[in-house]
UniProtKB/Swiss-Prot annotation:
Protein keywords: 2Fe-2S, Amino-acid biosynthesis, Branched-chain amino acid biosynthesis, Iron, Iron-sulfur, Lyase, Magnesium, Metal-binding
Self-association state and partner proteins as the record states: Homodimer.
GO MF terms held by the record: 2 iron, 2 sulfur cluster binding; dihydroxy-acid dehydratase activity; magnesium ion binding
The protein's name in its UniProt record: Dihydroxy-acid dehydratase
Cofactor(s) demanded: [2Fe-2S] cluster; Mg(2+)
Known EC number: 4.2.1.9
The encoding gene: ilvD
One Pfam family recorded for the sequence: ILV_EDD_C
Organism: Roseiflexus sp. (strain RS-1)
């Protein structure tokens, strides 16, 4: 039976001509018996530069035990991983989105090179999740993702805190609303151990997405990183991959149009990160499934926001587990008719079957009932208008104002904007414009958590809006409009906004407009000259030259 499952790896291990390969593998401890079994790749994103993925080495060991117990031979390899929380607000942040595609490339190359029969990808920090999903989808061999889990919240003066509160405290100190000593206390308390950032930020949004879309086993992601149950989650995942291999269930069997619609609905219902828009567009492209920004807006309009989660809500991510897990979210989606219950998942069961097993904690108010949502429509809005002809994205929780008209405060890059905010130069009703931070212009489309948190920390979260061709962290809150397309570096209208121009944001009408005549806009665009690329060689230059628009997922395209 094992031989029948070695559909790919026999090319590496079987026959007289493969004696050299077997000799090399025996040098690191594999036996003839090991090499006669299906070879399972363990794609690990463990790295010692962040808490998000630090537990994945131990988790991988348990996964490998499960693989061996189920009749397979595991072989572990690593990819790169960039921590958004560590690099935020620096030049290093440009590497974050770029790493998504490099992770996809790494897994694809390892799968092609070593001819693994199946792959489990261990993921945690933001870009490792979509990157691994993209790589597995390209290979289209049996495989799935296993999420490392959320960090526990910290505690400060009787309050639960996360990394979000550290960044907001920086702005509060700059505004004179908090002392440096208090900031240090928050810094020391916010991240008490391993795991991904602890709200419905990008990592937990994408972990939720992967269970709902069917590419992660239901019931695994919500278990926190430091929870003792994670060991058994890893072991069972190792056993499951052998079953997935026997059934020859592949990513593209799972990633249907219906599955993507389910995923978008989960982002809307949970108030998830706007980064999910980029990543789902990119993953859909790998799966060959048509998907556009309009799909996100349409699904969000009909899906209620039911999860009271940070950054704008009350609860941290571990409370999802305490409420009953992502199965409860799945049940809300299925019961409300917001998801296709017949969509298949990696366990071989449908989403409806998985949702039916949900055990909801009595009295929990983390995941609200459908008849008492936080608001009747989802948190994602897609805006267009003469400032964003190809679209832009904003995430709302329900308390934000829906109309804002004000003067543009224009900054060519994140650092200049941050200096102005910290320096007290931004006033109520200003609309901050940060441009040349898009996929090409950055390059790398940096997240603006430092800037948005400084705005909130300074007490301007309800009176100042921000518009950028860059991205936002999942920890961002307020009227922060990102992913503006076309970006400034491609000659989008954002490039010709001048200091003091009137901008109008109308969320009810899904519009963001520069209040100038068509003739004035045309004249400015005609006079605009593209800036020189910021990098002339290396990965940054290559990415800037090949990356597509944010409205297409910011994916690399073949010239």
């Amino acid at each position: 039976m094992s031989s029948d499952l070695k559909r790919r790896s026999r090319t590496i291990t079987d026959g007289r001509t493969r004696a050299g390969a077997r000799a090399m593998l025996k040098a690191i401890g594999f036996t003839d018996e090991d090499l006669a079994k299906p070879i399972i790749g363990i794609a690990n994103t463990w790295i010692e530069t962040m808490p998000c993925n630090i537990n994945l080495r131990a988790l991988a060991a348990r996964v490998k035990e499960g693989v061996r117990a189920a009749g397979g031979t595991p072989m572990e390899f690593n990819t790169v991983a960039i921590a958004d929380g560590v690099t935020m607000g620096t030049e290093g942040m440009k590497a974050s989105l770029i790493s998504r595609d490099l992770i996809a490339d790494s897994i694809e190359l390892m799968g092609r090179g070593y001819m693994f029969d199946a792959i489990i990808a261990l993921v945690a920090c933001d870009k490792t999740i979509p990157g691994a999903a993209m790589g597995l989808t390209r290979l289209n061999i049996p495989g799935f993702l296993l999420y490392g889990g959320s960090i526990a919240p910290g505690h400060w003066r009787g309050k639960e805190i996360t990394i979000q509160h550290v960044y907001e405290a920086i702005g509060a100190v700059a505004a004179g609303k908090m002392t440096d000593e208090e900031l240090k206390e928050i810094e020391d308390a916010a991240c008490p151990g391993p795991g991904a950032c602890g709200g419905q930020y990008t990592a937990n949004t994408m972990a939720t997405v992967m269970e709902i879309i069917g590419l992660s086993p239901m019931g695994t992601a919500a278990v926190p990183a430091a929870d003792p149950r994670k060991d058994s989650v890893g072991y069972r995942a190792g056993q499951l991959i052998m079953d997935v291999l026997r059934r020859d269930l592949k990513p593209r069997d799972i990633l249907t149009r219906a599955a993507f619609e389910n995923a978008i609905a989960s982002v809307a219902l949970t108030g998830g990160s706007t980064n999910a828009v980029l990543h789902l567009l990119a993953l859909a492209r790998e799966a060959g499934v048509p998907l556009t920004l309009d799909d996100f807006d349409a699904i969000s309009r009909r899906t209620p926001l039911c999860c009271d989660l940070m950054p704008s809500g009350k609860y941290s991510a571990i409370h999802v587990d305490q409420a009953g897990g992502i199965q409860v979210i799945a049940r809300r989606l299925v019961d409300g008719g917001f998801a296709h219950g017949d969509a298949i998942t990696v366990t071989g069961r449908t989403l409806a079957e998985e949702a039916a097993d949900a055990v909801e904690t009595p009295g929990q108010d983390v995941i609200r009932p459908l008849d008492n949502p936080i608001k009747p429509t989802g948190g994602l809005l897609v805006l267009r208008g003469n400032l964003a002809p190809e679209g832009s994205v904003v995430k709302l929780f329900g308390y934000e104002r829906t109309y804002h008209r004000g003067p543009a405060r224009v900054f060519d890059g994140e650092e200049a904007a941050m200096a102005a905010i910290v320096g007290g130069e931004i006033r109520p009703d200003d609309i901050v414009i940060i441009r040349y931070e898009g996929p090409r212009g950055g390059p790398g489309m940096r997240e603006m958590l430092g800037v948005t948190s400084a705005i909130v920390g300074a007490g301007l979260g309800q009176s100042v809006s921000l518009i950028t061709d860059g991205r936002f962290s999942g920890a961002t809150r307020g009227v922060m409009i990102g992913h503006v397309a076309p970006e400034a570096a491609r000659g989008g209208p954002l490039a010709i906004v001048q200091e003091g121009d009137e901008i109008e944001i109308n969320l009810d009408e899904r519009r963001v407009d520069l209040l100038l005549s068509e003739e004035e806009i045309a004249d400015r665009l005609l006079a605009w000259q593209p800036p020189a690329p910021r990098y002339e060689w290396g990965v940054m230059a290559r990415y800037g030259a090949l990356v597509s628009s944010a409205s297409e997922g910011a994916v690399l395209v073949t010239p």
